[in-house]
Amino acid sequence: MIRIMKYGEVSNEEIFARSMPTVNVTDAVAEIIRNVRERGDAAVKEYTEKFDKVKTENLLVSPEEMTEALTKTDPEFIAILEKAAANIRKFHSRQVRNSFIINDEPGVVVGQKVIPVDRAGVYVPGGTAPLSSTVLMDVIPAKIAGVKEVILATPPGKDGKIDPSVLAAAKVAGADRIVKAGGAQAIAAMAYGTESVPKADKIVGPGNAFVAEAKRQVYGVVSIDMIAGPSEILVAADGKSNPAYLAADLLSQAEHDKVASAVLVTDSMELAEKVRDELEKQIPQLERSEIARVSIDNNGKIIVADDLKTVIDIANEIAPEHLELCVDNPFDWLDSIRHAGSVFMGRNCPDALGDYMAGPNHTLPTQGTAKFSSPLSVDDFVKKTQYTYFTKEALAALAGDVAAFARKEGLTGHARSALIRTEG
């Protein structure tokens, strides 16, 4: 049963404690990366057989496999994918940054070019649920950014094939190449390249402890989006909120994983107790009730504060992945929210909307990193290059200042490179 605690009566350590993965996979992941780097496809296939219990002859999804998957996918679900994709494109298209040029001084031009990375790798977890939504959320921003090739890697099922709904989502989103591999071996393949998998410049997407550690270890060889931890939700609610709604929202994240975190922060003890009772009613109704039970009992908590301002202060300190703001006039509080991956406003906006259909991204910072990190966006798939042009006359006007600055730093070679062009 979820624990109720009164803010101010328990330690901050208890209030702000988070679930943390306890398994140490650093050495195991390093070995996987080394093998894939040295042996390419052969190593990826061996690890796929070892971890996923399936032999793969070809790491890439063929056109025939894609066609078969599309015929097996319910047309109504494909229509839902297309509707979700349209909303995701509409939102992320507003994120596109423009290059700029400044030439308001004679003989001087400075500017910035926004350039997409050449190739992006997208990781989509397999496991107990096919995450076709993650395909849309991670591939579409890359395509909007202008990435030339998007590689999608996801583990195969026991039949050696990718779930048809995942392939259908890949088709809708525009993935260019699909790799039947998961785990650290897939991250290594995209980071270093193999016979079948070209090297990516950026790798994005959530995953288990092996995937997270692999992304950490290959960072610097490639860029990554973030190192994602377990799923999180914090519901900030006043006493007028419907306890059944709040319990359902908490369970929507608790069912993800046994180490997922579901937290309610409220100014009403009465509501807290009603939500606790609702959780006990609703958990047995879930298909993934065993997972949700462990998550709620081990990592769930209800925090009761004196007022809504304190509720918001607690939310900012926790900096959750998902934050639901279940209060009257939620936009009055929006400016007070400083740290959250994604905020769901009002009493009729469950975070499931954001997971699938609303349009904003669902690949979000976890473990408090929302204090300094952002959701996945078009920005993750572009880089910026600056450029500078000076005529000889424009250089002459600044050469003395450049030289003085350089000499102050003890870099006389810098000074000379500016002055030599103005002599004679």
Language model feature labels by segment:
Residues 102-168:
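Conserved small-residue-rich beta-alpha loop and adjacent elements
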Residues 174-245, 249-252, 256-261:
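Conserved NAD(P)+-binding/catalytic subdomain of aldehyde/semialdehyde dehydrogenases
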Residues 148-158, 262-268, 275, 346:
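Short internal beta-strands
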